[in-house]
């Protein structure tokens, strides 16, 4: 089975997003990566960026098909997000101090929530998560949110491919 055929061979569904994202740039990059890994959608909960120009410009670059494959959703706050979450999906927080990603078995239908590098995932959001996972690293500083998302999606695809 070839890596680029993951989605067409029944890769379980997932969505990924950022809690209180600081920059539109990170959202844009995460969306491009999420589309490549077959995400159902990408979202931002209570975004903090005021300059949406990078996001708007990137949207123009995405084809209509790409926009349909991985739509972007913006939520006012965590309660808005939680109220609209479909049943049967498992919320997974990506935060330092959680279960190491190397030991984690991804749920078949997962929603991954990343925190911005300065504040992380809120206590309210963490409490709602069934799992909290972390990316093992040599240093204690957090990963860039886009990099963290890419690592988790790659790990997910490897574990479902094998």
Each language-model region and where it sits:
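Short beta->alpha connector loops at strand-helix junctions that form conserved
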Residues: 19, 45-46, 116, 133-139
């Amino acid at each position: 089975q070839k890596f680029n055929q993951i989605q067409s061979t029944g890769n379980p569904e997932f969505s990924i997003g950022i809690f209180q994202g600081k920059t539109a740039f990170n959202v844009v990059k995460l969306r491009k990566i999420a589309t490549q890994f077959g995400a159902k959608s990408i979202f931002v909960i209570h975004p903090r960026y005021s300059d949406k120009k990078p996001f708007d410009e990137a949207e123009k670059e995405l084809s209509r098909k790409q926009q349909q494959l991985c739509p972007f959703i913006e939520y006012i706050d965590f309660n808005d997000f939680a109220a609209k979450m479909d049943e049967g999906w498992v919320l997974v927080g990506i935060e330092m101090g959680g279960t190491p990603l190397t030991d984690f078995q991804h749920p078949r239908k997962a929603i991954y929530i990343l925190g911005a590098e300065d504040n992380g995932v809120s206590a309210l959001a963490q409490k709602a998560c069934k799992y909290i996972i972390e990316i093992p690293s040599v240093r204690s500083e957090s990963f860039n949110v886009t990099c963290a998302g890419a690592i988790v999606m790659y790990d997910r695809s490897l574990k479902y491919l094998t």
